[in-house]
From Swiss-Prot:
The gene is APOA1. Sequence repeats lie at residues 67-88, 89-110, 111-121, 122-142, 144-165, 166-184, 185-206, 207-227, 228-238, 239-262. GO terms for biological process: acylglycerol homeostasis; cholesterol efflux; cholesterol metabolic process; lipoprotein metabolic process; phospholipid efflux; positive regulation of cholesterol efflux; positive regulation of phagocytosis; positive regulation of phospholipid efflux. It comes from the Eukaryota. Residues 67-262 are annotated as: 10 X approximate tandem repeats. Keywords: Cholesterol metabolism, Glycoprotein, HDL, Lipid metabolism, Lipid transport, Lipoprotein, Oxidation, Palmitate, Phosphoprotein, Repeat, Secreted, Signal, Steroid metabolism, Sterol metabolism, Transport. This is Apolipoprotein A-I. Residues 1-18 form the signal peptide. The modification Methionine sulfoxide is found at residues 109, 238. It is found in: Secreted. InterPro entries: ApoA_E, Apolipoprotein_A1/A4/E. The lineage of its organism: Eukaryota, Metazoa, Chordata, Craniata, Vertebrata.
Length: 262
């Protein structure tokens, strides 16, 4: 599992650097990439959530209940955007302070990671090639089953799933075994380097304790500064939740009346 995590980390770093190479931009730091990734992830969740709400409202059940979830979702999204704007300067100050305090440690770790990445890259290329081969083999095995499913009846769904599961498990096991076999030594090397760095920090005068104390202090300050924005969020959510509650109760009451009338 550690080897898999290392693989994903190296792939993420390598892919990000390649993008800046082709675009001729200044490469982002790992810190900036983490923050950008978090922002993109949150936006994707928000957009996909709105799509699900819209699909539900367009369904027959959604039209019958008439909960107006989409309006409430937009109100909630607007409230969250305002809160994020209020917290922006506070969180930026926190990230800047934390980045400054850990700059030396991150610089050493980036150097170690770059060395490991250079050693691992040939194995990653080989893994990608083998992965494509395994996927093609899996596709060839699954193709007849897919055709059989299309020709069969619905009651064969469970049977098809039972037959597909061993093939999928076989593919996962092969990929995991290959990664662990090829990358485990490099994962151990990186872990040993990190342990050595941390031991050096301990021997150098309690830098780790200082990092922990400063991070705790900054988190406490962040919590105090965020209280007004979080209170605004709570006040903004109350009308949305109340409206949703009223809509649900009205829908239940309407359904009860229809059942009693029958």
């Amino acid at each position: 599992m550690k080897a898999v995590v290392l693989t994903l980390a190296v792939l993420f770093l390598t892919g990000s650097q390649a993008r800046h190479f082709w675009q001729q931009d200044e490469p982002q730091s790992s810190w900036d990439r983490v923050k950008d990734f978090a922002t993109v992830y949150v936006e994707a969740i928000k957009d996909s959530g709105r799509d699900y709400v819209a699909q539900f409202e367009a369904s027959a059940l959604g039209k019958q209940l008439n909960l107006k979830l989409l309006d409430n979702w937009d109100t909630l999204a607007s409230t969250l955007s305002k809160v994020r704007e209020q917290l922006g300067p506070v969180t930026q100050e926190f990230w800047d302070n934390l980045e400054k305090e850990t700059a030396a440690l991150r610089q050493e770790m980036n150097k170690d990671l770059e060395e490991v990445k250079q050693k691992v890259q040939p194995y990653l290329d080989e893994f990608q090639r083998k992965w494509h081969e395994e996927v093609e083999i899996y596709r060839q095995k699954v193709a007849p089953l897919g055709e059989e499913f299309r020709e069969g009846a619905r009651q064969k769904v469970q049977e098809l799933q039972d037959r597909l599961s061993p093939l999928a498990q076989e593919l996962r096991d092969r990929a995991r075994a290959h990664v662990e076999k090829q990358l485990a030594p490099y994962s151990d090397d990186l872990r040993q380097r990190l342990t050595a760095r941390l031991e050096a920090l301990k021997e150098g005068g309690g830098s780790l304790a200082e990092y922990h104390a400063k991070a705790t202090e900054q988190l406490k300050a962040l919590g105090e500064k965020a209280k007004p924005a979080l209170e605004d969020l709570r006040q903004g959510l109350m009308p949305v939740l109340e409206s949703l509650k009223v809509s649900i109760l009205a829908a239940i009451d309407e359904a009860s009346k229809k059942l009693n009338a029958q």
